[in-house]
């Protein structure tokens, strides 16, 4: 948890928390790089000892400025500033730049697209295969076994999906999100840039 001195420094920098005991920080955390931030719920903050390089090649100090962070983790050496709404239920990895964004959030019950049924398209015209009647006949027992097998596979897939669905938005290492209104229920890959 934060030390008493770190809490005082954060409050001096116009930061507040619903409960300072729910905020954890990395070893190289510096409260001087956090300004005008409201923390709600369990939040983890990484090291803020380094700089980040913008797409224009400008070196800026890492840190969090002008933001509301709710139940989220922020990795080492990120620059997060001017979040007009909030960052809610997100895991932000190291060296990310997130500036001038309204909201990043994860909503209740999201599946991140996992477990959705996708129907295949019919084959293009002229690509079909002609079957003769006796080649394609199936007995009722074969059809029933196939149906049962499909249902068993679907049930196994849905059990695995339910077990492994992420509960939070994830922003991987080095991603940049700039001047964007809303990111909801997303998994943003390493090095991705969103404008």
Q: Which role fits each region the language model picked out?
A:
Residues 1-195:
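Domain-scale signature associated with acetyltransferase and cell-envelope carbohydrate enzymes
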């Amino acid at each position: 948890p934060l030390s008493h001195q770190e809490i005082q420094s954060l409050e001096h920098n116009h930061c507040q928390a619903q409960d300072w005991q729910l905020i954890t920080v990395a070893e190289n955390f510096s409260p001087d790089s956090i300004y005008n931030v409201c923390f709600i719920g369990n939040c983890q903050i990484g090291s803020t000892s380094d700089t980040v390089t913008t797409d224009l090649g400008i070196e800026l100090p890492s840190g969090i400025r002008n933001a509301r962070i709710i139940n989220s983790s922020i990795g080492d050496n990120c620059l997060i500033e001017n979040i007009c709404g909030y960052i809610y239920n997100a895991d932000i990895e190291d060296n990310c730049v997130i500036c001038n964004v309204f909201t990043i959030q994860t909503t209740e019950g999201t599946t991140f697209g996992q477990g959705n049924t996708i129907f295949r398209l019919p084959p293009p015209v002229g690509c079909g295969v002609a079957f003769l009647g006796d080649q394609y006949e199936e007995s009722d027992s074969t059809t029933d076994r196939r149906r049962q097998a499909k249902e068993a596979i679907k049930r196994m897939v849905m059990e695995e999906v339910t077990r492994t669905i992420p509960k939070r938005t994830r922003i991987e290492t080095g991603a940049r999100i700039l001047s964007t209104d809303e990111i909801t229920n997303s998994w943003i890959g390493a090095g991705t840039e969103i404008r």
